[in-house]
Regions:
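Short gly/ser/thr-rich secondary-structure transition/capping motifs
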Residues: 42-48, 104-108, 127-128, 255
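N-terminal helix-turn-helix DNA-binding module of bacterial transcription factors
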Residues: 1-60
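Short, cationic motifs built from Arg/Lys/His that form the positively charged side of catalytic pockets
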Residues: 19-20, 33, 119, 195, ...
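Alpha-helical recognition/docking segments in bacterial nutrient-uptake
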Residues: 2, 61-171, 175, 235
Length: 335
């Protein structure tokens, strides 16, 4: 394996210059830094982990706090894709990841205690109960934190633009001639609040009057619950012509309930999803949905967490919104 000295010789610079480039020090030209990094990748140079940790007072280990109470785990395609992108970017920057939990060898501990036990440099938090006292304790600690799809005061947050996503779906339904548009949303979280706001904002902009019974309390990733809410909508004296579901997976509940009622999608009723996962492309008919940009969400979260770790004095907490895109399908017909 090549050494720091070998890399310096290859690039025609001093060992000190190579060290500055690899440690992202500011007093080196950007072109020189990039040239050295390209050479390091080409030569397969890897810094000695122990020496690097001793020199920088960092472990180059990032914590991931992911608690999926619905037990869909990392098979939940949306969050799995976000965390995969986070991992790829972290590794590209020389960091490993560790999952944070309550248990180490049978010993119970708080999330913050686990972070200290593993000596992580920072933590990304996603898909948790953000009101859990242990999560709040971690967020309020001195550990650098980036949250995904939730905002804490004075903390870095990376957010999918859920307001824009629902507005895009409503306006697409409107453009297809639909005026009776229902929305089955997920459980009450900041994500849901933003989606509900986007739904009503679009309706207001379009001059749509939406009956209260058209907006239903569903549950993310819960097929049966969304099937129940679909049946409730079908039982109304004037049923909607288009239903927006909490996510693509739960839309399967709508597909099932509509089939049970002898209704055809989209001939009898139109359906929309959210997330843009692979399932939306293979279900029949293919689902009109809003695809969240999981690659950008994960990469941005990693970039911002590493900025907080490596440049704490100049990195300010901010809320970054990541746009998605509308995906066409055959589940909505023009009236």
């Amino acid at each position: 394996m090549p050494s720091l000295k070998d890399l310096a010789k290859e690039c025609g610079v001093s060992v000190a210059t190579v060290s500055k480039a690899l440690n992202d020090q500011p007093d080196i030209a950007a072109a020189t830094r990039e040239r050295i990094r390209v050479a390091a990748r080409r030569m397969g140079y890897l810094p000695n982990a122990a020496a690097r940790a001793l020199k920088t007072n960092r472990t180059y280990n990032l914590g991931v706090l992911f608690v999926d109470e619905r037990q869909s785990g990392l098979t939940h395609e949306y969050f799995s894709a976000v965390l995969d992108s986070f991992k790829v970017e972290a590794e590209k920057r020389g960091y490993d990841i560790t999952f944070i939990n309550h248990n180490i060898s049978g010993r119970s501990m708080t999330y913050l205690e686990h972070c200290h036990y593993r000596s992580v440099d920072g933590v990304v938090i996603a898909c948790v109960n953000f009101y859990d006292p242990q999560v709040v304790e971690l967020v309020n600690s001195d550990v650098p934190v980036v949250t995904i799809d939730h905002v804490f005061n004075n903390r870095m947050a990376v957010l999918s633009d859920n307001v824009a996503g629902l507005k895009a779906l409503v306006k697409q339904a409107w453009a297809c001639g639909h005026r009776r548009i229902a929305f089955i949303h997920g459980e009450k979280t900041s994500v849901t609040e933003n989606r509900i706001a986007g739904f009503y904002q679009a309706c207001e902009e379009l001059g749509l009057e939406i009956p209260e019974e058209y907006v239903r309390d569903g549950v993310y990733h819960d097929v049966e619950r969304c099937a129940e809410e679909t049946r409730a909508l079908l039982a109304l004296p004037q049923r909607p012509t288009c239903i927006i579901f909490p996510d693509d997976f739960s839309a399967l509940g709508g597909y099932n309930a509509l089939a049970e009622a002898g209704l055809s999608i989209p001939d009898d009723i139109s359906v929309m999803g959210y997330d843009g996962i692979y399932l939306s492309r293979v279900v029949n008919p293919s689902l009109v949905t809003y695809q969240q940009n999981t690659a950008a969400l994960g990469q941005t979260a990693a970039d911002k967490l590493i900025e907080l770790i490596e440049h704490p004095r100049v990195t300010l907490p901010e809320q970054l919104r990541v746009s998605g895109r509308l995906l066409s399908g055959r589940s909505v017909r023009s009236l």
